[in-house]
């Protein structure tokens, strides 16, 4: 298992791919208990990394604001809730 510090270096896609692999291994139920705990902890770190990257991307997304005539006037933070 890789060093937890390297999770911070992973791209979203790489972290998500590894997380999906961990979930599959745990769901299969063929991993010994001690190893299950270790890969679960790795999965938690990967989940946090993915959430961090998604929050960062969300903060960068803007919506285009328009005037009454529909002409662009600028941008504003995108309200996704």
Curated annotation (Swiss-Prot):
Cite the InterPro entries for this sequence: Exonuc_VII_S, Exonuc_VII_ssu_sf
Q: Report whether NAD shows up as a keyword of the record.
A: no
Asked if the record carries the keyword Cell division, the reply is: no
Keywords carried by this UniProt record: Cytoplasm, Exonuclease, Hydrolase, Nuclease
Tell me one GO molecular function of this protein: exodeoxyribonuclease VII activity
* Xref: NCBIfam families: PRK00977.1-3 (NF002139), PRK00977.1-4 (NF002140), xseB (TIGR01280)
Q: Which HAMAP family match?
A: Exonuc_7_S (MF_00337)
Quaternary structure and interacting proteins, as annotated: Heterooligomer composed of large and small subunits.
What this protein is called in its record is: Exodeoxyribonuclease 7 small subunit
Please report the organism this UniProt entry assigns to the protein: Rhodopseudomonas palustris (strain BisA53)
């Amino acid at each position: 298992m890789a060093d937890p510090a390297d999770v911070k270096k992973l791209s979203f896609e790489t972290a998500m791919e590894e997380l999906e692999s961990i979930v599959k291994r745990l769901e299969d139920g063929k991993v010994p208990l001690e190893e299950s705990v270790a890969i679960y902890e790795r999965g938690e770190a990967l989940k946090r990394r993915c959430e961090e990257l998604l929050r960062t991307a969300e903060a960068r997304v803007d919506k285009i604001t328009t005037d009454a005539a529909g002409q662009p006037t600028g941008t504003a933070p995108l309200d996704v809730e």
